[in-house]
């Protein structure tokens, strides 16, 4: 069993007109970035006016960073404050404050992830099963067919890609395939790293799987009732999972023990009412967002 934790309602962020699909914490800051079905890319500073509490009303105002022409499925922080965004229609945008958005069209299938690869390139996963590599100037460097179905998630610094073939692929720094193995069935939707460097995956089968670097299964947990959409690891030793079953769960990143369930039963007025699609940590604060259009912030403590 892991150490007991306490989860308190901190605040909620409202303004998106459709479901939220992506969250990002900007490095070394209290700022999170959100994006979703309305195409809006929004910045929220959780520490702008000091600690924010639920009572009486949400008091963090979002700042529109960019309005894109179609739903945004993924975000990545680039160099020097640049934000990268991938869309439903195969567009990758490079967003720089004070400048017009730049973009490259990679096809017509959705962009499900953008990740910094081991060699510094930018890896992009497409619904077509293609893995695309770009440089920081949006120049196309390479593209290859990896899966027969969508590529859904990536740990770029480890060379790992998961997808709707139910597989995890391991590639080298140059993008050459080293190995692959079966994981969540039929689809792997999210990947994370635990405290020991093992791989954690979640997917349509609602299972959390802990695997070694070679794909050997170490632990398997029926973590949720429905599809697991998101995983987020904390430097403080926690792993959060978010699911179509409307719950967020917090696990011990060291041993996989379940520490807390966040749902409408325990938090009647603040738990998610629809699918949870995205998660990110800001220190002890956990941000969760989904189809109810609201970003909910939770304070986690021991």
Where are the predicted features?
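Intrinsically disordered, low-complexity acidic/Ser/Thr/Pro-rich linker and tail segments
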Residues: 1-22, 30-31, 37-42, 47-73, ...
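A structural motif specific to WD40 beta-propellers
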Residues: 8-10, 52-53, 101-102, 141-142, ...
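WD40/WD-repeat beta-propeller blade N-cap
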Residues: 13-20, 56-72, 105-111, 144-151, ...
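Hydrophobic core register within WD40 beta-propeller blades
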Residues: 23, 75, 114-115, 153-154, ...
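Conserved strand-to-loop turn within each blade of WD40 beta-propeller repeats
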Residues: 35-38, 86-89, 125-128, 162-165, ...
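WD40-repeat beta-propellers
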Residues: 41-45, 93-95, 134, 169-171, ...
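Blade-level signature of beta-propeller repeat domains, shared across WD40, Kelch, NHL, RCC1
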Residues: 275-302
């Amino acid at each position: 069993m892991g150490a007991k934790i306490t989860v308190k309602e901190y605040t909620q962020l409202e303004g998106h007109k459709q479901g939220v699909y992506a969250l990002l914490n900007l490095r070394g800051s209290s700022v999170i970035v959100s994006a979703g079905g309305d195409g809006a890319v929004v910045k929220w500073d959780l520490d702008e006016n000091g600690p924010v509490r639920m009572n009486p009303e949400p008091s963090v105002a979002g700042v529109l960073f960019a309005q894109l022409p179609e739903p945004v499925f993924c975000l990545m922080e680039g160099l020097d404050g640049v934000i990268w965004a991938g869309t439903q229609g195969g567009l990758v945008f490079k967003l720089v404050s004070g400048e017009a958005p730049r973009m490259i069209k990679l096809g017509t299938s959705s962009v499900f992830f953008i990740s910094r690869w081991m060699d510094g390139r930018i890896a992009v996963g497409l619904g077509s099963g293609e893995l695309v590599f770009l440089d920081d100037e949006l120049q196309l460097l390479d593209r290859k067919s990896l899966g027969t179905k969508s590529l859904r998630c990536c740990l770029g610094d480890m060379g790992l890609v998961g997808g709707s073939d139910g597989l995890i692929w391991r590639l080298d720094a140059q993008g050459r395939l080293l190995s692959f193995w079966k994981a969540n069935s039929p689809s792997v939707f999210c990947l994370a790293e635990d405290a020991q460097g093992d791989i954690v995956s979640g997917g349509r089968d609602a299972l959390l799987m802990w695997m070694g670097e070679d794909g050997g299964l170490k632990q398997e947990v029926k973590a949720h009732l429905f599809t697991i959409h998101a995983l987020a690891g904390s430097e403080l030793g926690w792993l959060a999972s978010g699911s179509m079953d409307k719950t967020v769960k917090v696990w011990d990143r060291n041993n996989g023990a379940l520490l807390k369930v966040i749902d409408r039963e325990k938090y009647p007025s603040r738990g998610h009412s629809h699918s949870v699609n995205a998660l990110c940590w800001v220190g002890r604060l956990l941000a969760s967002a989904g189809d109810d259009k609201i970003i909910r912030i939770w304070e986690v403590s021991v």
